[in-house]
Design a protein with these regions (language model features):
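Long, low-complexity, charged/polar intrinsically disordered regions in eukaryotic proteins
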Residues: 30-101
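Short amphipathic alpha-helical interaction segments
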Residues: 132-148
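N-terminal amphipathic/basic-hydrophobic helices that include classical n-h-c signal peptides
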Residues: 1-14
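An alpha-helical, amphipathic repeat domain used for nucleic-acid recognition
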Residues: 97-114
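Long Lys/Arg-rich low-complexity intrinsically disordered regions in nucleic-acid-associated proteins
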Residues: 69-71, 105-109, 124, 138-139
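Short helix-coil junctions and helix-kink-helix linkers
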Residues: 114-136
């Protein structure tokens, strides 16, 4: 019964998914966050492990289309495109290098805590959400990727 519930403590290893990075076109001379992250992800074979501000691991995978990525912590479709990082960096620049992460779990887009000038609000707008809509909050993963790439610091409650 424990085996059926996956509670038996078995030693089976989960094989990582096979990733084809050959279709990932990267501009290695670009200063855009999207291109920097794509280049680093491609250099790592299309799979990395990043860590949240709390130290929890997140698996990141390049998708075969060469323009999007997924994570074991982001169960949403369609996959996120790399350009979301350009929007986040643009927000950081507009706000003098600091931006509140915001909260998409408890608030709808545009409500206090989930405003357009927060990281979660910026991501929601990038995904085509409109004011008043519920949003998925992927900031913990996006912030971890930005920190891994050396683009921003994943601070408590804010990106720096």
């Amino acid at each position: 019964m424990l085996a059926a519930l996956n509670l038996g403590g078995g030693t089976e290893k989960v094989m990582p998914k096979e990733i084809d990075v050959s279709r990932m076109d990267v501009d290695y001379t670009s200063t855009l966050a999207s291109e920097i992250i794509k280049a680093k992800l491609k250099a790592h074979g299309g799979h990395i492990t990043v860590y949240t501000a709390r130290g929890l691991p997140c698996e990141i995978y390049a998708e075969s289309d060469g323009t999007t990525f997924t994570s074991d912590k982001l169960p949403v479709k369609p996959a996120y495109d790399y350009k979301v990082f350009d929007d986040i960096v643009e927000l950081l620049i507009k706000q003098g290098g600091r931006a509140k992460k915001g909260n998409g779990r408890n608030y709808k887009l545009g409500e206090p805590g989930c405003e357009e000038n927060t990281v979660v609000g910026t991501i929601a707008l990038h995904r085509g959400r409109t004011i008043g809509e519920s949003v998925f909050d992927p900031v913990f993963v996006m912030a971890a990727i930005l920190e891994w790439a050396g683009i921003a610091e994943n601070g408590r409650g804010e990106l720096i």
